Amino acid sequence: MTAAYPPAEHMLRDLRFSFEHDTEGRASRAWLPVVDELCTDHGSARAGVLATLVDVIGGGLAAAAAAPDWIATADLTLHLVRAALPGSVVAANARVLRAGRTTVVIEVALSDDTDRMLGAATMSFAVLPRRDHNPDMSSALSDGPSTMAVETSRLRAPFLDALGVAVLDAAAGSIEVPVTDWSRNSMGALQGGLVATVADASAEVALREATGAALVVTDLQVSFLGFGRTGPVRAHADVLHASPQFGSARVEIVDSGADTRLMTLASASATRELAV
């Protein structure tokens, strides 16, 4: 991993997020411009992409709320009710629901640039003792928006291709993803929102194979059990329900380069289409 974080080419830059944090550390906002590369073949932003937005803004707010301690993500739940279309900007409004001695809980509301609700998410975090390598979040608290994008930052391929997703067995939802400098978090592991994207992709391919229908994931519940530092990260899905209109699946994600250690358990629901 490079010394500076994020490196010059990194998903945090290429997604062109912008952020704004209040100075009291109780609320944050983020904006994501939706481009074609972030969308499924239905033409709307992938659930994993929006989970990544939630993870980034929620994680930053949780770290500020837990200061001077640090945090580790325990779980993320996302529910989408409407499609986020190319050319729109998704706004994520995050607020602290609880900031205790051992736990921080964040709620994130998602809307488009016409203030239509797109979905909602919650995240919970374990509070940990600070270590020397943990970032100092106090510098992020300001009244003005900021971004990690630079002039050349942009996606040059569809999001799953940029992540390096390879389908090994569609029926089993078996996919493989490398852990690279582009996808690592500040701890040197696959970034949490990208782990959710792996769950999204695994469930999608399994449910499409099971139903013969072009279902898209609309709901994710992700429990983070460990880091994926070595890679490749591998996922497989067990289909729980499958019909032409709706499906659900359970997904396990392991770090195959670290004795196939279990990293994540997730559940996903998919439907034929989201409202526009």
Question: Can you annotate each of these PLM segments?
Answer:
Residues 1-276:
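Terminal targeting signals and extreme-terminal segments of soluble enzymes
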